[in-house]
């Protein structure tokens, strides 16, 4: 069985309503440095690292990549939840609306038509379960993707079952088939960016 250290990205330079793929702001870069130190302390030797393809996750992974002299593997299955629109303001309004509901409600939401959210949630979990089945790994991901993993591990059904802070680390365990939550990451009142 492997442990999965799932990290929410650092504070982004812009929110969902301002930029489709922002990097980190100054605080986010500091958070990324701190979480790299934290992970290097927790893990006695380098392990495989995976990152969402989005810039804020790739930049969060960079300090650990430098420290471990490795490169995180881009894993599209741990990217942020897809939205039914590319319009930045409309997608932010959509996200805020669906965040207060359940995964069941999201799957049947008429304004979210065309996206298979059950499949997306399953893809996130499958990536974690298979990549972490026999080895410890680090995964840099997103707020809602972390919630997808949390819900799979705990049986919760809310889209937002917990509020992972920027650069918080949640630890899961994979037996190759399911996820088990070992440690929930730090929560904060945080803006989804």
Where are these regions (language model features)?
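Active-site-proximal alpha-helix that buttresses catalytic centers in soluble enzyme cores
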Residues: 2-75
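Generic beta-sheet signal
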Residues: 4, 47, 133-144
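Short active-site segment of divalent metal-dependent hydrolases/proteases
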Residues: 12, 145-146
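Short aromatic-enriched loop/helix-cap "lid" or pocket-rim segments at secondary-structure transitions
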Residues: 16-19, 61, 84-88, 193
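Active-site metal-coordination segments of metallo-dependent hydrolases
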Residues: 18-27, 108-111, 115, 160-161
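Phosphate-handling substructures
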Residues: 66-123, 182-183
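Domain-level recognition of soluble alpha/beta enzyme cores
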Residues: 156-180
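Short, solvent-exposed aromatic-acidic interface loops
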Residues: 182-193
